[in-house]
């Protein structure tokens, strides 16, 4: 499954990128589509079959599952 993490800060996105690298999960930092967030503008896109709930960190504002170029929110910090 493919996901996009949206963050409060650029540093949060970079930390998550490093976190996924430590788990050997291929990921990419990239601009966040405006329809997903107006905060920091940098997100992390990755693919995993692991339980996404175990991969939520305090830096994440929202997490989206990507299917057929559609974004479905699977986590919101609020």
Language model segments and positions:
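Amphipathic, hydrophobic secondary-structure cores in small proteins
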Residues: 1, 25-44
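A short beta-strand micro-motif
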Residues: 4-5
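Generic, ordered loop/turn and secondary-structure boundary motif
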Residues: 8, 15, 31-33, 37, ...
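Helix N-cap motif at beta-to-alpha junctions
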Residues: 9-12, 46-51
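Short amphipathic alpha-helix segments
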Residues: 11-24
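Short secondary-structure junctions
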Residues: 23-26, 57-59
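C-terminal structural segments of small proteins and small subunits
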Residues: 48-78
